[in-house]
């Protein structure tokens, strides 16, 4: 079995994050896998790909030149001669489906995002029958794939893209006299809701325990967020830029916040739980299923700065409770997203693909 894993880009974050773990399982099941990226973007996923010894082919092109991308993909796949295509996200899926029609190769398609642009939703709904199997990366995305794309249960499976690592770095408990460190990881984009977080910080006001809030990530909103914080007189916020070692970043925190307007599974928040951090998150995607409200963290309505400020005040006001709460979050995550469970689901999908 030769699987061509087609992705939009090798950008750090997003759908590229789980590729090494997924390929590892497919290889363990006896498949030969090669990754085909339609464009490079920032290339920050490549160190992880290299560490996993992935075979990667990257097209030198942009994000809108779809005809050129289709020609490149068709040529590349005709040369590599896969037995199956595995696609991720809308562009890779649509182009992969077109190549599959020409090359008569079955397609398996991931869905990672809870939000789809209306045009993408219409396109995928019209072509969904071209993929033999659809995979949702979380409970929410799997349900939405069935509803929005009209994919029947016989062609839809759920494979959470997070594989827990018990050896990942863990955070240290907060101690009296320390600055309380709260953090977040994500691109500086409206969907991540960092403007809502800044609004919440402005509402928080004075706290008895000093704190700082670090956001690790780059993006087009950097200047706007800085200006918003400055206008609100917020001095506790630091935009730390891209974080190459998220495990070390998370291990240096006492709590984590994910104020997103939309998510699928949200790998970063689950990495935070893995590090033993309590998580405050918007109730979107998989997050309300992973967080036990008031026990392992808190959930708030997306876009609600007032509710977020209220929970932040509770967190900052009781820092001595955070370590125990984060410990419960970690235990629950290691059980729900164990490596054995991750591998078993992947191997069952691979067995199903052999029967196509």
Model-identified regions with their sequence ranges:
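Short His-centered aromatic/hydrophobic patch
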Residues: 87-93
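A short, well-ordered alpha-helix in the C-terminal region of glycosyltransferases
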Residues: 307, 314, 321-336, 342-345
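Conserved acidic donor-binding segment of nucleotide-sugar-dependent glycosyltransferases
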Residues: 293-294, 298-305, 314-319
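Short hydrophobic beta-strand element within catalytic cores of glycosyltransferases
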Residues: 37, 278-281, 291
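Aromatic "clamp/platform" in nucleotide-sugar-dependent glycosyltransferases that forms part
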Residues: 242, 261
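A conserved, positively charged/aromatic
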Residues: 107-136, 150
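A conserved mid-protein helix/loop that constitutes part of the nucleotide-sugar donor-binding site
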Residues: 13-21, 184-203, 220-226, 270, ...
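Donor nucleotide-sugar binding/catalytic pocket of nucleotide-sugar-dependent glycosyltransferases
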Residues: 130-168
């Amino acid at each position: 079995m030769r699987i061509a894993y087609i992705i939009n880009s090798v950008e750090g974050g997003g759908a590229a994050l789980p590729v090494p773990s997924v390929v590892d399982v497919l290889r363990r099941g006896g498949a030969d896998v090669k990754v085909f990226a339609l464009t490079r973007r920032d290339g920050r996923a490549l160190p992880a790909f290299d560490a996993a010894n992935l075979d990667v082919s990257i097209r030198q092109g942009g994000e809108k030149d779809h005809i050129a991308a289709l020609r490149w993909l068709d040529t590349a796949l005709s040369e590599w001669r896969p037995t199956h295509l595995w696609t991720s996200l809308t562009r890779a899926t649509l182009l992969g489906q077109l190549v599959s029609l020409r090359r008569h190769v079955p397609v398996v398609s991931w869905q990672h995002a809870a939000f789809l642009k209306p045009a993408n939703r219409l396109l995928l709904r019209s072509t969904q029958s071209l993929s033999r199997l659809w995979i949702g990366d979380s409970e929410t995305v799997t349900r939405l794939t069935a509803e929005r794309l009209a994919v029947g249960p016989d062609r839809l499976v759920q494979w959470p893209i997070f594989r827990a690592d018990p050896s990942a770095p863990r955070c240290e408990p907060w101690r009296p006299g320390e600055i309380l460190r709260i953090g977040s990881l994500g691109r500086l984009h409206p969907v991540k809701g960092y403007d809502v977080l800044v609004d919440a910080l402005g509402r928080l006001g004075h706290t008895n325990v000093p704190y700082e809030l670090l956001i690790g990530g780059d993006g087009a909103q950097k200047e706007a967020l800085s200006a918003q914080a400055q206008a609100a007189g917020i001095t506790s916020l630091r935009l730390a830029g891209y974080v190459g070692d998220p495990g070390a970043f998370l291990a240096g925190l006492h709590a984590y916040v994910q104020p997103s307007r939309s998510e699928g599974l949200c790998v970063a928040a689950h990495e935070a739980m893995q590090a033993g951090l309590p998580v405050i998150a918007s109730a979107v995607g998989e997050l309300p299923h992973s967080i036990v409200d008031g026990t392992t963290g808190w959930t708030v309505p997306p876009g609600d700065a007032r509710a977020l400020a209220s929970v932040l005040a509770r967190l900052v006001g009781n820092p001595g409770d955070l370590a125990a709460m984060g410990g419960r979050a970690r235990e629950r995550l290691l059980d729900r997203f164990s490596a054995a469970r991750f591998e078993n689901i992947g191997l069952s999908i691979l067995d199903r693909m052999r029967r196509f």
